């Protein structure tokens, strides 16, 4: 019961942190969550529990890094492989050496091996904190990808270095050759293990699908279990579980499109479920981090043998050393024209960008969790030297780097984009959202909801067309092009009609009736000033096709109207085939709009002799289709935000708009 109450309190703190962030958006959510965690643990009856390092890594770090590996663009990571490796490997080992000697020189009470261990656990950067901070400021895309790639790799290298340093401190023995061989084995073994296990899981899912087992809930459960299985298996083998889940995430991303392209429901459910899981896990990581800090601080602050001001000074010196080393490392290797890769297309930051990279090296959960894994006793049974001080220094550096980044990054980064640029991004995002909605509707369309789906598709195509209008200096230009495309469709229909007449598929009378109507449509599209007259004639045509006007026997009227309908269906299909072959990227939306018109026309003609079951039933079907599309749009907004294609304020505006649209739909106004 106590564990359940603790979990409830932690989840409540996460919810409160996001509410607080709405009122003080200039403070990132992770910092608010850490502060609330500290507050919750500061009272005698507050949250007090010992952090289980192994459980923390498997429960939080594994799924978070798996998701980061899955969503980070692989091509961009590959292009930045040289700088990422220099930061994730080279800088980590440089930090261990320089930081270790600096800490030991400054605090002789900490043995050199333990100082190396502290420097090693301070070397990994927190990709979650970086993502949260970058959401508030406009950072160059190259820097963001670099920081994400570094965060995926340096957790493993830092933890491996930490493991060997602490082992040396505990046993008093250290072999550089053995450590190097073990590092290569643990790293490469972790990557290989992640790829192999992911491949086996993917094959297993494909096998289930071939057996007809396409239950979304079952496949979603397999997805959720995947990072835990990979991490635990890798650790059991003795290789890096962290690198294994990163490799597993990347492997799943490679196979994702082929696996789930035909399972649109799984895509929607997967995106929504993972968004919730990641939201909770990210929040728990920082809240738990905050709850551990008061106990760590109180031990040192209550120790009369050490000056409080002195240990605060230690924290500031260590933080400054880490940032300075990071700055010099990036500056020398980048401006040295990259002896690893001299490709001019690789992003090369200037002095300001180098400073951005240095400040963005925020430490976080991995640092604190790793430091808590330091044993209490050495091999000979004596207490581990200055363990509490090491924990305090680690916690202090985490807070210091987080606060510095929060304050300095907005100053260094560019101001918010100009209105014109912002509107352009907003327009682009809205087009992507509409395309997502259209894809969702088409994938989910069946015979039962086909009429309602086509009606909703027409509405979204109209919205897409209206967005397209906004990119032109005059809306007349796009309207004129649409008339040209419609005229091309009519021309294709005429040619198909003549071929059917020549083959003897239809009587001459039917061909004459439709040819006359096609001529009227040509005039309509060629001369917009005759719109009123043409619309009237078109209405008469549709009425005649569906109900008949001539004083002929009833069966004769029905037969003739049925033949005309069937012929028009064939000509409309010919028009669709022509437009599909001749559509251009520049006016793709216009062509799709006309094609959709023809598809709706075909459906109406084929089902004109049937009545809809009821208007209420039809509207309910439309509402169901629209709500599914809205959910897909929400998921796409989150994806665009996570991939840095839109800023936080644009994502907020889009979400608010979608909320208004959904409310209008539920009230029957949309």
Swiss-Prot record:
Free-text function comment from the UniProt entry: Transporter involved in the efflux of sodium, potassium, lithium and rubidium.
Signal peptide (residue range): none
Induction (UniProt): Constitutively expressed, with higher levels at stationary phase.
GO cellular component terms given for this protein: plasma membrane
Annotated NCBIfam families: a_cpa1
Subcellular location: Cell membrane
Source species of the chain: Bacillus subtilis (strain 168)
Name by which UniProt lists this protein: Sodium, potassium, lithium and rubidium/H(+) antiporter
UniProt KW keywords: Cell membrane, Ion transport, Lithium, Membrane, Potassium, Potassium transport, Sodium, Sodium transport, Transmembrane, Transmembrane helix, Transport
Gene Ontology terms, MF aspect: potassium:proton antiporter activity; sodium:proton antiporter activity
Family: Belongs to the monovalent cation:proton antiporter 1 (CPA1) transporter (TC 2.A.36) family. Nhak (TC 2.A.36.3.2) subfamily.
Membrane association type: Multi-pass membrane protein
TM spans (from-to): 5-27, 46-66, 83-103, 105-125, 156-176, 182-202, 228-248, 276-296, 314-334, 355-375, 389-409
GO biological process: potassium ion transmembrane transport; regulation of intracellular pH; sodium ion import across plasma membrane
């Amino acid at each position: 019961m106590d564990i359940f109450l603790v979990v409830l309190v932690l989840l409540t703190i996460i919810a409160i942190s996001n509410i607080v962030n709405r009122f003080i958006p200039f403070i990132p959510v992770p910092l608010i969550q850490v502060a609330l965690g500290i507050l919750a643990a500061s009272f005698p009856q507050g949250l007090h529990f010992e952090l289980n390092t192994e459980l923390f890594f498997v429960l939080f770090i594994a799924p978070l890094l798996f998701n980061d590996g899955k969503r980070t663009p692989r091509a961009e990571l590959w292009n930045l492989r040289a700088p990422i490796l220099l930061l994730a490997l080279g800088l980590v080992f440089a930090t261990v050496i320089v930081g270790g000697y600096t800490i030991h020189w400054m605090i002789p009470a900490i043995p050199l091996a333990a100082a190396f261990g502290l420097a090693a656990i301070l070397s990994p950067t927190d990709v979650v904190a970086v993502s949260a901070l970058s959401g508030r400021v406009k950072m160059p895309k190259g820097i963001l990808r670099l920081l994400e790639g570094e965060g995926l790799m340096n957790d493993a290298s830092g933890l491996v270095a930490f493991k060997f340093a602490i082992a040396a401190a505990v046993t008093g023995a250290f072999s550089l050759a053995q450590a190097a061989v073990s590092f290569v084995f643990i790293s490469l073994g972790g990557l290989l293990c992640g790829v192999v296990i992911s491949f086996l899981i993917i094959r297993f899912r494909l096998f289930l699908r071939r057996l007809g087992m396409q239950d979304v809930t079952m496949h979603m459960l397999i997805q959720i279990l995947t990072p835990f299985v990979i991490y635990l298996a890798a650790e059991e083998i003795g290789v890096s579980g962290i690198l294994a889940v990163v490799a597993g995430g990347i492997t799943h991303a490679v196979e994702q499109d082929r696996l789930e392209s035909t399972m649109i429901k799984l895509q929607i459910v997967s995106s929504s479920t993972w968004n919730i899981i990641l939201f909770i896990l990210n929040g728990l990581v920082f809240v738990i981090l905050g709850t551990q800090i008061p106990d760590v601080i109180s031990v040192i602050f209550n120790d009369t043998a050490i000056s409080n001001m002195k240990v605060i000074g230690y924290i500031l010196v260590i933080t400054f050393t880490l940032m300075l080393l990071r700055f010099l490392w990036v500056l020398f290797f980048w401006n040295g024209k990259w002896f690893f890769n001299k490709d001019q297309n690789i992003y090369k930051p200037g002095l300001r960008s180098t400073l951005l990279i240095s400040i963005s090296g925020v430490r976080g959960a991995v640092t604190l969790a790793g430091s808590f894994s330091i044993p209490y006793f050495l091999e000979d049974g004596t207490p581990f030297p200055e363990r509490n001080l090491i924990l305090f220094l680690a916690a202090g550096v985490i807070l210091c780097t987080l606060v510095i980044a929060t304050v300095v990054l907005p100053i260094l980064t560019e101001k918010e984009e100009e209105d014109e640029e912002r509107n352009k991004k907003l327009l682009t995002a809205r087009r992507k959202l509409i395309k997502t909605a259209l894809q969702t509707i088409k994938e989910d369309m069946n015979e039962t909801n086909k009429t309602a789906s086509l009606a909703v598709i027409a509405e979204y195509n109209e919205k897409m067309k209206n967005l397209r209008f906004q990119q032109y200096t005059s809306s007349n230009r796009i309207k004129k092009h649409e008339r040209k495309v419609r005229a091309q469709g009519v021309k294709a229909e005429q040619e198909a009609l003549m071929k059917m007449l020549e083959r003897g598929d239809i009587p001459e009378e039917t061909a004459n009736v439709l040819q006359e109507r096609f001529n009227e449509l040509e005039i309509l599209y060629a001369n917009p000033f005759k719109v009123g007259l043409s619309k009237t004639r078109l209405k008469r045509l549709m009425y005649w096709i569906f109900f008949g006007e001539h004083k002929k026997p009833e069966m004769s009227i029905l037969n003739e109207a049925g033949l005309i309908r069937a012929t028009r269906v064939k000509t409309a299909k010919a028009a669709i085939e022509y437009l599909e072959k001749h559509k251009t990227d520049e006016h793709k939306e216009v062509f799709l709009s006309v094609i959709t018109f023809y598809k709706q026309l075909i459906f109406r003609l084929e089902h004109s002799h049937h009545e809809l079951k009821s208007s209420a039933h039809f509207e309910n079907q439309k509402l169901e289709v629209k709500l599914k599309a809205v959910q897909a749009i929400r998921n796409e907004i989150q994806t665009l935000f996570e991939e840095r294609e839109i800023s936080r304020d644009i994502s907020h505006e889009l979400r608010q708009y979608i909320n208004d649209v959904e409310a209008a739909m539920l009230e029957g106004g949309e």
